[in-house]
């Protein structure tokens, strides 16, 4: 008898077949890609830029290194890493979603970021790169959309060089009850309305709120990273735990 729990996963609060989730997530990001950056600024009041700056500072990236910006979307981190690694370095912006990758490529080329950046459509669960290839991997607000998170973490571990580090920047669990209540009210009542006004799509932003609630909390994700092989795993809470930055090393 087939264990149905092994064949299903969550899409927001809904239970769906595992082989259907990737397509459903793809539709969300096809819908929002064109105004993704605008919506990030509106939804976070611009604070996402600070969260990403913290991640960049924690990356330890240096000139000449090879970086994977996984689920890199419109290229915010890639743009910064491109300047840091310089001409002899390389940044790979990888995303499973063709629409997001197209927006990211056009955005970076429009501001003259070329030469040391390449673009790859890739599934985090089966990364198409050699073993021990990257000095640093970042995945920013992308892991919660992955169907098989454990599989993706193992794939990241495989392609990371010994001595390299993984940084996972993701929405997490607020630390304080009053903040959690206010955050819930904002997420479930305000975000969908913003989505409806600016991209005529309340459903995608309802999914965003639900997917955040279904994502593992800080300590659970830390354990998942350790089980995938990462060592010295730590995390830093930001904005009261609304976002957490996890960091782990491969030795």
Swiss-Prot record:
Name of the protein: Ubiquinone/menaquinone biosynthesis C-methyltransferase UbiE
Keywords: Menaquinone biosynthesis, Methyltransferase, S-adenosyl-L-methionine, Transferase, Ubiquinone biosynthesis
Function: Methyltransferase required for the conversion of demethylmenaquinol (DMKH2) to menaquinol (MKH2) and the conversion of 2-polyprenyl-6-methoxy-1,4-benzoquinol (DDMQH2) to 2-polyprenyl-3-methyl-6-methoxy-1,4-benzoquinol (DMQH2).
GO molecular function: 2-methoxy-6-polyprenyl-1,4-benzoquinol methyltransferase activity; demethylmenaquinone methyltransferase activity
SUPFAM superfamilies named in the record: S-adenosyl-L-methionine-dependent methyltransferases (SSF53335)
Pathway note: Quinol/quinone metabolism; menaquinone biosynthesis; menaquinol from 1,4-dihydroxy-2-naphthoate: step 2/2; Cofactor biosynthesis; ubiquinone biosynthesis
Family: Belongs to the class I-like SAM-binding methyltransferase superfamily. MenG/UbiE family.
GO terms of biological process kind: aerobic respiration; menaquinone biosynthetic process; methylation
Organism: Photorhabdus laumondii subsp. laumondii (strain DSM 15139 / CIP 105565 / TT01) (Photorhabdus luminescens subsp. laumondii)
Enzyme class label: transferase
Disulphide linkage map: none
């Amino acid at each position: 008898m087939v264990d149905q729990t092994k064949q299903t996963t969550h899409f927001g609060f809904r239970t769906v077949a595992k082989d259907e989730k990737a397509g459903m997530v793809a539709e969300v990001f096809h819908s929002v890609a064109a105004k993704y950056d605008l919506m990030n600024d509106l939804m976070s009041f611009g604070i996402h830029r600070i969260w990403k700056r913290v991640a960049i500072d924690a990356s330890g990236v240096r000139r000449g290194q090879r970086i994977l910006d996984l689920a890199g979307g419109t290229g915010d981190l890639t743009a910064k890493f491109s300047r840091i690694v310089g001409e002899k370095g390389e940044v790979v912006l990888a995303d499973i979603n063709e629409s997001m990758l197209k927006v990211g490529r056009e955005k970076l080329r429009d501001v003259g970021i070329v030469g040391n950046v390449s673009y790859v459509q890739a599934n985090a669960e089966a990364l198409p790169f050699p073993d021990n290839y990257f000095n640093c991997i970042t995945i920013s607000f992308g892991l919660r959309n992955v169907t098989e998170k454990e599989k993706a973490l193992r794939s990241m571990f495989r392609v990371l060089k010994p001595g390299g580090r993984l940084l996972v920047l993701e929405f997490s669990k607020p630390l304080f009850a009053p903040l959690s209540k206010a955050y819930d009210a904002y997420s479930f009542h305000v975000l969908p309305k913003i989505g409806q006004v600016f991209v005529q799509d309340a459903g995608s932003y309802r999914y965003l709120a639900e997917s955040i609630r279904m994502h593992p909390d800080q300590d659970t994700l830390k354990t998942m990273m350790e089980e995938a092989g990462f060592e010295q795993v730590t995390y830093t809470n930001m904005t009261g735990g609304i976002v957490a930055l996890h960091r782990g090393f491969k030795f």
